[in-house]
Regions:
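Acidic/histidine-rich alpha-helical segments that form the ligand environment
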Residues: 39-81, 91-102
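Short, contiguous alpha-helical
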Residues: 1-41, 82-130
C-alpha cells in the first residue's frame, strides 16, 4: 500500500460511484483502461507506481470536482432517497464512500508517519479541500 495507490483508489471510487453508478456515464480516462469485472479491485494499486505524485493528486482533484458536480445535480433532481440503477439509495452510496475515505485516511496517516514522523493532526496550509 502506498500513498499514491490510496489516491488513485479513492479517485477510482469517486469515478465509479458518481459518474458510472449514479450518472450512468461511461468511465473516463484513465479509468476506461480497465476491465471492471476483472481489474476493479487491484488496478489503482497496481498502476499507481507508474504515475507521478502530482499526476495522482491532479487525477483525484479532477475526479472529486466532477463527482461534486454530479452529486449536486442528483440532489437537486431527486434528493438522498433516490434509487440508483443497481437498487442502492444515494444516501447509502454516500455513507459507503464516507466509510471508505475514513478507512483510507487512517491508512494514509500511518504511512505518512512512517515516512517522516508527521501525523494527520493538521493538513498543510496549501492543501486543497473539496
Amino acid at each position: 500500500m502506498t500513498l499514491g495507490g490510496l489516491l488513485k483508489h479513492l479517485a477510482w471510487l469517486e469515478e465509479l460511484d458518481f459518474q458510472h453508478r449514479l450518472a450512468g456515464q461511461p468511465l473516463s480516462a484513465p479509468f476506461d483502461q480497465l476491465d471492471v469485472e476483472r481489474d476493479w479491485e487491484d488496478w489503482p494499486w497496481r498502476t499507481a507506481v507508474d504515475d507521478a505524485p502530482d499526476a495522482l493528486r491532479a487525477l483525484w482533484v479532477d475526479t472529486v470536482h466532477r463527482s461534486r458536480e454530479t452529486l449536486t445535480a442528483a440532489l437537486a433532481r431527486s434528493g438522498l432517497e433516490q434509487t440508483l440503477p443497481d437498487g442502492m439509495s444515494l444516501r447509502r452510496l454516500l455513507a459507503d464512500l464516507i466509510e471508505e475515505y475514513a478507512r483510507h485516511t487512517g491508512h494514509a496517516d500511518l504511512l505518512r508517519e512512517q515516512v517522516d514522523g508527521v501525523t494527520g493532526e493538521a493538513a498543510p496550509q496549501d492543501f486543497w479541500v473539496p
